[in-house]
Amino acid sequence: MSAPARVLVVDDSPTMRGLITAVLSSDPEVSVIGQAGDALEAREAIKRLNPDVVTLDIEMPNMNGLDFLEKIMTLRPMPVIMVSTMTHRGAEATLAALEIGAFDCVGKPGPGEHRPFGDLAEKVKAAARTQRQFSQPAAAVAPPPSVADFRVGRKIVAIGSSTGGVEALIAVLQKFPANCPPTVITQHMPPTFTKSFAERLNRLCAPVVQEATDGARLEIGKIYLAPGGERHLQVSGGSAPCCRLVDRAPVNGHRPSVDVLFDSVAELAGRNAVGVILTGMGRDGAAGLLKMRHAGARTLGQTEKTCVVYGMPRVAHELGAVEQQLPLTAIGEEILKLTAARKEGTE
């Protein structure tokens, strides 16, 4: 049996530190080795204790979590899980943290929540196991192709991601031209975060990116992100495909679920689709991607070396669902090739 993941809990609230410590300490594979109430205490604790993982509150006195994270990633890179309030402001800060290099995020529980921090221990263990090189500089982002350079086919693109997906999706979608194929995405994320993430992607990418709404028509040049929370994203509609938000129990522990999205794309589009599974914990999306491949779709998976967590892509690959495994930097361009988004004048 491997040694427990050693965690430092950083939060200015003694109550929240106690709750996080209690939740993590209930898992025998996790050991809370220290607590800190602000960035100064945390800096000294990191030097003294050398934790495997840090949980870090976004909002703290003196130096906020975002500024402290930047210092960690510059001076002593390590896996950091951000703990944020479930507000628009908290979501914006958390998304910025994930782009800086935070491993993942969790939302602070609301009043009466049944299982506060229910998946935190699993995220901590995944963070401790990760082989990611946190000190690697981010790759330069190439400008997106121009609209005039491409003509788009009739295929739908479906993408699923979880831990590490914020950075991965930005890397993929920034390769898309403004007239990209209709694209639907399920990214595991707390409920209030997906709207902020869609807005952020819309600012960073050439196509229009929006949080999916029930009945929204799938259109060229638009990307639809499943809202976090109570419903799953599906596609339906035959010759006039649209987004559907459906009430169903969680699948693979998730709502929205990547499997639910991929299943619906397989049924609606068959061979006229491309399925992509990116970095993430667990197995959500693997069975759905296999269904897409059996229906004739082209399927891609992210390579282990470029994943933050090689979980979902690994299971999909082992099931035979992945036609090609590619490094993250190559996935966007391959999607365009497979959707017949070719340069004008070529056949």
Curated annotation (Swiss-Prot):
It is found in: Cytoplasm. GO terms for molecular function: phosphorelay response regulator activity; protein-glutamate methylesterase activity; protein-glutamine glutaminase activity. Residues 6-123 form the Response regulatory domain. The active site is at 162, 188, 284. The keyword Hydrolase applies. The modification 4-aspartylphosphate is found at residue 57. It comes from the Bacteria. Residues 150-342 form the CheB-type methylesterase domain. Involved in chemotaxis. Part of a chemotaxis signal transduction system that modulates chemotaxis in response to various stimuli. Catalyzes the demethylation of specific methylglutamate residues introduced into the chemoreceptors (methyl-accepting chemotaxis proteins or MCP) by CheR. Also mediates the irreversible deamidation of specific glutamine residues to glutamic acid. Contains a C-terminal catalytic domain, and an N-terminal region which modulates catalytic activity. HAMAP family: CheB_chemtxs (MF_00099). This is Protein-glutamate methylesterase/protein-glutamine glutaminase.
